[in-house]
Each structure stands twice: as structure tokens, then as C-alpha cells.
Amino acid sequence: MSKVTFRADDDLVAAVEDLDASKSEVMRNALRAYLTTHAAADDVPVESVNTPVRGAATDAQKDVNVTIRVSSPSAVEEVRTTPASGGRADAEEPGDDGETDAEHADTSATGDESVCSQCGAELSADHVYCPNCGGKATHRVFCECGDEIRADWAFCPRCGRRTVSGDALDSA
């Protein structure tokens, strides 16, 4: 059994001494009675987690999942400049005109200035990372030997190792 010390004013100590039981027994019984009544009141939750805050959600209040896919930097500009009609942006997807991603990359990278693929900020030729969002400006591919290779090459011309893109092309 542990020892508990109580501090009380003189009137309370005198009232406890006037009782027939010992001070320790009186204080134990008082503490048990207090904990029993207050613990029972504390066990009842004030609010239930399952209690709805608002009423049942209507169709207009339900969550909506939105997926935005940007396949080129120019698509970012199209989405930004396209006005939304009725809460819905009907931006034309790039690539619908039959142009492949590789052709689009070749046409957009003709000048010294390029555009960040993540945020659309203009990048100069010496930028490795976008100064606006920190996204990688150049997506250069290197072989395990350290030589820079093109992403569409299946083998490294320096060491002859098979590249990751070569493995992907082989399995396709």
C-alpha cells in the first residue's frame, strides 16, 4: 500500500479527529467515494465521435475527387487561361492533335529558354533546378559508367551496358 499525504486546514483536521475511525481510514473512504462518483461521471463521453456535426450530406455537399493531368508546359498555360464554365474547366488536352510527346519536347526545346514542366516558370539554359518550385529543369539520363546518354537509347555507346529504357522497350 502506498502512502498519500493530505494537507487540510485546521477546521477539517478537527472534524476528522472527532470521528470514531482513524484519520487514515476516514481519508481512504473519502477518497474512494470521491473517485467512485467522479470517475463514473468522467466515463460518460461528453460528445461521441460518431455524432454527426451537420445533417446528412446532400449530393451537392459530397466530396468531389478532381484529377488534373498536365503532359506539357504549354498545357499549364492552357489550363490557367481557360475560363471555367459552371465550375468545370474544359481545357483541350495536348496530344489530342496527334503530336507525340517526343515531337512536342523537340519543338518546345528549340530556344535557350525553356519552361519548367511542374510550374510553367521560364528557365534559362544554365538552370539545373527551377528557381520557382525546385523541380528538376533537365531530365538528363546517365549510364552506370557515368556517361550521359539519351533516354531512348537501348545501349550505352561508351560501355555497352543495357539502359533502363532499353529494358522497358524490350519488355513492351
Curated annotation (Swiss-Prot):
It is found in: Cytoplasm. Residues 72-113 are annotated as: Disordered. A zinc finger (DZANK-type) spans 116-160. GO terms for molecular function: DNA binding; zinc ion binding. Transcriptional regulator involved in the control of cell division. Is a specific and direct regulator of the cdrS-ftsZ2 operon. Acts by binding to the promoter region upstream of the operon. The CdrSL-FtsZ2 transcriptional network might coordinate cell division timing with cell growth. Belongs to the CdrL family. This is Transcriptional regulator CdrL. It comes from Halobacterium salinarum (strain ATCC 700922 / JCM 11081 / NRC-1).
